[in-house]
């Protein structure tokens, strides 16, 4: 009799996705981040659910309800910090996952890639709304500043902002709707992740060489299940080290002050994972221009398949492109650093140069390097 996992309608789907899936024999640890992102998402949904049981989405009690979770709820402190730092781990895995895609040319699977970009936007939106919920100073002013950016949209901008706020400023209505959206979005992300996987399994995984691996496949289980479990253990180790030793390392001290609309913090800044985009936003002195640059800094990923001029898919055998890729990584780290600094000399000019460099590398230098490498191969 055929094994039940191959005949049962539900188990068959699981089997074809995680057990008998033919996978390339040479995918490295850079291919672990997909499963790690899945684990992060499950962890965030579970910790978030338990937090939602004790949280109140009201301006008068939101801050004290978070304090209550940390002080009075059984293991509330660990759930809260796992959720807050889990978001950081989520974004670390996301950036690594996208970086892997850029380096090894995974963006040539266009459907998978575009769903991935939508997933990135959805995750960023979710994290932003989640940051508003504790209703500390940085929550309130972060929400005010970021939502206000939409007022740069010509003609409908102001109406749009007031519609999102549910009033004439960030207030009770804003907090309530942000909580509602923050709760529903992870489930939308989970659904999109399923579609992401569906499209990936239409083509099969890429591999470090960028060459077709159809002639050399191995079953996903046990090889990559074991590998993913190791990755998961390392992820949990890193997360719990952060949670138990320095839970506030990546947070902002200002968020331990209750939100006060009458007192603006000296330096308004988002969480660390948004700082690179925030630096690009601030580097343009025009409001609309800044907002466009902010959106384009991530939307530019959609253009990657069209900017690919190389005859090879992966950067594995392309030293010039490799060099430019790591310059891009360094540039993004520079932007992250600048985003957290005050708007003064020399940070302004460094931010502007790093922003120009970012777009120049992706739009001009990397496609040029690929063309040069193509010509070098002719010799």
From Swiss-Prot:
Binding of heme b b562, residues: 83, 182
Main localization category: mitochondrion
Molecular function terms from GO: metal ion binding; ubiquinol-cytochrome-c reductase activity
Keywords: Electron transport, Heme, Iron, Membrane, Metal-binding, Mitochondrion, Mitochondrion inner membrane, Respiratory chain, Transmembrane, Transmembrane helix, Transport, Ubiquinone
Cross-referenced Pfam families: Cytochrom_B_C, Cytochrome_B
Membrane topology, record value: Multi-pass membrane protein
InterPro entries reported in the protein's UniProt record: Cyt_b/b6_C, Cyt_b/b6_C_sf, Cyt_b/b6_N, Cytb/b6-like_sf, Cytochrome_b, Cytochrome_b_C_euk/bac, Cytochrome_b_N_euk/bac, Di-haem_cyt_TM
Transmembrane residue ranges: 33-53, 77-98, 113-133, 178-198, 226-246, 288-308, 320-340, 347-367
PROSITE patterns: CYTB_CTER, CYTB_NTER
Signal sequence coordinates: none
SUPFAM superfamilies membership: a domain/subunit of cytochrome bc1 complex (Ubiquinol-cytochrome c reductase), Transmembrane di-heme cytochromes
Annotated Gene Ontology cellular component terms: mitochondrial inner membrane; respiratory chain complex III
Binding site for heme b b566: 97, 196
Cofactor note: Binds 2 heme b groups non-covalently.
Entries under PANTHER family matching the protein: CYTOCHROME B (PTHR19271:SF16)
Function: Component of the ubiquinol-cytochrome c reductase complex (complex III or cytochrome b-c1 complex) that is part of the mitochondrial respiratory chain. The b-c1 complex mediates electron transfer from ubiquinol to cytochrome c. Contributes to the generation of a proton gradient across the mitochondrial membrane that is then used for ATP synthesis.
Family membership: Belongs to the cytochrome b family.
More details: Heme 1 (or BL or b562) is low-potential and absorbs at about 562 nm, and heme 2 (or BH or b566) is high-potential and absorbs at about 566 nm.
Subunit text: The cytochrome bc1 complex contains 11 subunits: 3 respiratory subunits (MT-CYB, CYC1 and UQCRFS1), 2 core proteins (UQCRC1 and UQCRC2) and 6 low-molecular weight proteins (UQCRH/QCR6, UQCRB/QCR7, UQCRQ/QCR8, UQCR10/QCR9, UQCR11/QCR10 and a cleavage product of UQCRFS1). This cytochrome bc1 complex then forms a dimer.
The name this protein goes by in its record: Cytochrome b
Organism: Cephalophorus nigrifrons
Lineage, top ranks: Eukaryota, Metazoa, Chordata, Craniata, Vertebrata
